[in-house]
Amino acid sequence: MKRILLFLATNLAVVLVLSVVLNIVYAVTGMQPGSLSGLLVMAAVFGFGGAFISLLMSKSMALRSVGGVVIDTPRNEMEHWLLETVRRQANQAGIGMPTVAIYDAPDMNAFATGAKRDDSLVAVSTGLLHNMTRDEAEAVLAHEVSHIANGDMVTMTLMQGVVNTFVIFLSRFIANIVASRDSEEGEGSNMMVYFGVSMVLELVFGFLASFITMWYSRHREFHADAGAAQLVGKHKMIAALERLKMGQESHLEGSMMAFGITGKRSLSELMMTHPPLEKRIAALRNM
């Protein structure tokens, strides 16, 4: 879970920075914001640029945000088991060996991130290692490996790029209409209105668009559960989810939340990056 909210937050920050740059480009080049074709091209460049920059930064940012410690050489039997389990599952799934890390947190969680199937990260909380059985922890790891094998990070980035493009385009299109009505106040005032309205609308539309990315995240969780069931058996995956029902709420934030094993509770399922555990368990039982 930690993975998705961090990805979304990073993406939003990058898009806002790029939006400021886009306004500077307009000012320096004299390009008219009202040019629909030019605006659409610029929105796509900056929209996809923000998403892919977030993806490329995801491993380092994820490790830094949780204080993760990469396991290069196992220091104990638990770390040795963790490395060998991830290695075995990666071979089964046909992906390169991910970087494996442990981070200190009381909740039972794990997440995967990374720009490529052969250059990814799997991080596990100490709470998961201390409170789950080996079979349950193995299922959680298989879930994260399945996220990587399914290419969920890249497809999420592509979806976010499309969403960003429309957010930037619609925000600036509407801002141009609003600013045009105040053109009698002078060109300087006109640009300030355009800049202010476009930034506010990007925040509003970005929030509304997050419902789309959260829906996609929930959809991919079912696929990752199914992939884990193929790797280790559905009974282990069901046991892991049953254990999570008794555990604490996730402490993961940002983009990592979407690719964790579980997420935060919410009053509405629409605001959740993960489906309710009951639905995930039912889906596995019906396989």
UniProtKB/Swiss-Prot annotation:
Binds 1 zinc ion per subunit. The keyword Repressor does not apply. Its main location: membrane. Keywords: Cell inner membrane, Cell membrane, Hydrolase, Membrane, Metal-binding, Metalloprotease, Protease, Stress response, Transmembrane, Transmembrane helix, Zinc. It is found in: Cell inner membrane. Its EC number is 3.4.24.-. GO terms for biological process: proteolysis. Its cofactor is Zn(2+). The active site is at residue 144. Belongs to the peptidase M48B family. PANTHER family: PROTEASE HTPX. This is Protease HtpX. It comes from Vibrio cholerae serotype O1 (strain ATCC 39541 / Classical Ogawa 395 / O395). The gene is htpX.
